[in-house]
């Protein structure tokens, strides 16, 4: 359980602030911190407690994730929020479970995060849904029926998401052929040569932010002109900044877009968040050097925090087991990425996704998917 120092309740932030997912982790933390600025206290049995946020960097590394999780556990957190990057969530999950501390995933979309773990929940949609969304988009909107599927070897997110895309493509009568690369690869010329000679009419690349920019630039430099598609990871302004005018015909699914007029809760979030970021130099830096762009992982951080404080109040306790039970039964209306309710696996029940594209160095809204 957790011991409270004075009248505080501790919430752990389990996120990468370094490594290949550091940029994404920082944007999720901003969402969590912004939510905390709006709701800085919780009321437990009529008594007000201040929420103290404690961060541990999992460094985007599967091997370092358990130590980061252990840090939070030893500091007596009541609940954990995170992480960006499914591999780190999967690696840390058993530690949270054994310590009876519930964790709320932000944008970690691999089904394995919550599978067989009663203590892991998540607010985002998951890869089977996202894979189907993008396969339908590729097939029906872009006419891409014979895709190259670029996968990072040994990465849970990349392989899992790619597999769901491939299955749905085949169900629709199309094809997706796997082309693998090693983790630290920076030269994709062999893959591009294969794509050209095989005549693939689309690329699906569920890869990191760092790799995304290289794949886009090298594809266009080598004369590969087909649509390049991906998922939530690509919703990061740095990809647009680093690819410039090479970023043509790029599409990816995301959790949220500020331009979707049908999302009223989202509009209020966008206004408030931009103001809050603009107040502080470090916040601007962590948001990718701007107060105007909002990555769709940021509202995932916000929604996860709101779920956490709601569950603590419902539980009437700072004990992990009680908070876990409250989360399992939780229903929260009017969050930024939609109403929240968890299924028996602890996954958010979601039917909503947006598809974005890159235009004139910016990430812009393309369409909405309602399954």
Cite the ranges covered by each PLM segment:
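Extracellular/periplasmic bilobed ligand-binding domains
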Residues: 96-98, 162-259
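Extracytoplasmic "Venus flytrap"
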Residues: 12-33, 56-62, 85-87, 150-159, ...
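Extracellular/periplasmic periplasmic-binding protein-like sensory domains
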Residues: 221-300, 357-358, 363-370
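An alpha-beta-alpha
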Residues: 120-183, 201-202
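Periplasmic-binding protein-like
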Residues: 13-15, 72-84, 104-106, 148-151, ...
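Short, low-complexity disordered leader/linker segments with a strong preference
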Residues: 1-10, 41-45, 74, 369-371
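Beta-alpha junction/loop-to-helix N-cap segments that form part of ligand/metal-binding clefts
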Residues: 23-28, 42-114, 123, 181-189, ...
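Segments of small-molecule ligand-sensing domains
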Residues: 281-299, 307-360, 364
């Amino acid at each position: 359980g957790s011991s409270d120092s004075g009248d505080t309740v501790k919430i752990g932030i389990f996120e990468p602030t370094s490594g290949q997912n550091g940029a994404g982790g920082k944007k999720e933390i901003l969402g969590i911190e912004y939510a905390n600025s709006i709701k800085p206290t919780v009321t437990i049995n009529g008594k007000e407690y201040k929420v103290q946020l404690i961060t541990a960097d999992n460094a985007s590394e599967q091997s370092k994730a358990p130590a980061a999780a252990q840090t939070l556990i030893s500091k007596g957190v009541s609940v954990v929020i995170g992480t960006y990057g499914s591999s780190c969530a999967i690696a840390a999950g058993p530690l949270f479970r054994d310590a009876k501390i519930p964790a709320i995933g932000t944008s970690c979309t691999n089904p394995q995060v919550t599978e067989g773990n009663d203590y892991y929940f998540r607010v985002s949609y998951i890869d089977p849904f996202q894979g189907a969304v993008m396969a339908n988009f590729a097939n029906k909107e872009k006419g891409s029926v014979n895709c190259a599927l670029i996968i990072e070897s040994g990465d849970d997110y990349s392989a899992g998401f790619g597999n769901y895309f491939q299955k749905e493509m085949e169900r629709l009568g199309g094809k997706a052929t796997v082309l693998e690369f090693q983790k630290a690869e920076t030269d994709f010329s062999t893959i591009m040569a294969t794509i050209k000679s095989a005549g693939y009419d689309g690329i699906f690349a569920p890869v990191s932010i760092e790799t995304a920019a290289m794949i886009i630039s090298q594809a266009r430099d080598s004369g590969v002109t087909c649509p390049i598609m991906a998922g939530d990871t690509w919703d990061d302004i740095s990809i647009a900044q680093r690819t410039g005018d090479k970023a043509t015909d790029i599409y990816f699914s995301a959790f949220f877009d500020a331009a979707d007029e049908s999302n009223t809760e989202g509009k209020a979030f966008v206004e408030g968040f931009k103001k809050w970021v603009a107040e502080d130099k470090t916040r601007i830096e962590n948001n990718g050097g701007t107060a105007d762009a909002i990555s769709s992982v940021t509202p995932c951080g916000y929604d996860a925090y709101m779920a956490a404080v709601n569950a603590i109040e419902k539980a009437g306790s700072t004990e992990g087991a009680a908070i876990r039970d409250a989360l399992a039964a939780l229903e929260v209306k009017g969050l930024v990425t939609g109403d929240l309710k968890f299924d028996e696996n602890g996954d958010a029940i979601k039917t909503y996704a947006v598809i974005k594209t890159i235009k004139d160095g910016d990430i812009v809204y393309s369409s909405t998917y309602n399954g």
